[in-house]
């Protein structure tokens, strides 16, 4: 299990507690709060130390700074390791891959991988491709259509909730599901391109590279050559940023489809509003049907049941 520690102020810890309100669990002695997300278990202590432990603690910690205060110079390219990309790769011909839907109770997980040459990267920038976190759903859908019109090679995978829940019941962590989705998306994309022009692969890092490799090895797969990992990859690589938009657009469309099928709007995220909607859905369709709409191992399921 990986871990990440940050040191912050008590004011920031209170903001964090409010942010994780719907995911709080029992608080251990000496702690201010403990919360459990799909990426990590977060424990905040009176000393100001916040510990993130789980399959992707870096991803969760990055929301709050990701590194101890006054230590950011060590992270000029985020967390450096033997699988870190060289800066020049970001402007060369490369594949980028990213996912969406992992922290959302309702809806699937989607993963996209996209290959862009130097020339295509310029076109992607011209149509407004950038970090999808700074774009609303309407803009994401629009740019995703424009990416498709550019005929830039990509692959897009969707893991529906029913399959997600079956894998989770078999003992798969979400980290393993994401690793296999990234691997298969890249596999499919490699079949569409001339690999001789490929200089490398950039994956938006959600776990340590050795952990990612173990996930692949457990399914008798191996890491693709020249694969690199970096956190916040979409802010470095236009290929990852474009893949992120494609994955997010597919997730948003899937949420629209599920909402129409459920005959109620299914909110994104994992907030108290999600708990209330899940309770309504259970009343309307029965608990068994929840499997088609939600990641049922999330704490929201138990919270929804308490509202019935």
Swiss-Prot record:
Keyword Magnesium: yes
Cofactor: Mn(2+); Mg(2+)
Reactions this protein catalyses: Endonucleolytic cleavage to 5'-phosphomonoester
Binding site for a divalent metal cation: 98-99, 204
GO biological process: DNA replication, removal of RNA primer; mismatch repair
EC id: 3.1.26.4
GO CC terms, sorted: cytoplasm; ribonuclease H2 complex
A Pfam family that the UniProt record links to this protein: DUF3378
Keywords from the UniProt entry: Cytoplasm, Endonuclease, Hydrolase, Magnesium, Metal-binding, Nuclease
Function: Endonuclease that specifically degrades the RNA of RNA-DNA hybrids.
PANTHER family in the record: RIBONUCLEASE, RIBONUCLEASE H2 SUBUNIT A
Family statement drawn from the similarity comment of this UniProt entry: Belongs to the RNase HII family. RnhC subfamily.
Record-given protein name: Ribonuclease HIII
Annotated source species: Oceanobacillus iheyensis (strain DSM 14371 / CIP 107618 / JCM 11309 / KCTC 3954 / HTE831)
């Amino acid at each position: 299990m990986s871990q990440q520690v940050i040191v912050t102020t008590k004011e920031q810890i209170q903001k964090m507690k409010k942010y994780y309100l719907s995911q709080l669990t029992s608080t251990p002695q000496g702690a201010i709060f403990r919360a459990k997300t799909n990426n990590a278990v977060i424990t905040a202590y009176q000393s100001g130390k916040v510990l993130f432990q789980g399959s992707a603690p870096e991803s969760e910690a990055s929301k709050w700074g990701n590194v101890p205060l006054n230590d950011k110079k060590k992270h000029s390219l985020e967390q450096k390791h033997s699988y870190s990309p060289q800066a020049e790769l970001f402007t060369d011909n490369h594949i980028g891959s990213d996912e969406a839907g992992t922290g959302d109770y309702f809806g699937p997980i989607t993963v996209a991988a996209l290959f862009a040459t130097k020339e295509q990267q310029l076109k992607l920038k011209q149509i407004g491709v950038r970090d999808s976190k700074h774009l609303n759903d309407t803009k994401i859908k629009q740019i995703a259509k424009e990416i498709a019109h550019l005929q830039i090679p990509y692959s897009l995978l969707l893991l529906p909730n029913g399959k997600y829940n079956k894998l989770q019941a078999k003992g798969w962590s979400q980290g393993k599901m994401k690793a296999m989705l990234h691997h298969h998306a890249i596999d499919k994309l490699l079949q569409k391109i001339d690999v001789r022009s490929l200089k490398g692969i950039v994956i938006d890092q959600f776990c340590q590279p050795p952990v990612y490799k173990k996930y692949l090895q457990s399914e008798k797969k191996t890491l693709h050559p020249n694969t690199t990992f970096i956190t916040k990859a979409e802010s470095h690589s236009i290929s990852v940023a474009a893949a992120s938009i494609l994955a997010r657009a597919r997730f948003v469309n899937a949420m629209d489809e599920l909402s129409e099928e459920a005959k109620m709007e299914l909110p994104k995220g994992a907030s108290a509003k999600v708990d209330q909607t899940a309770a309504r859905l259970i009343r309307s369709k029965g608990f068994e049907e929840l499997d088609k709409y939600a990641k049922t191992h999330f704490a929201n399921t138990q919270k929804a049941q308490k509202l019935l």
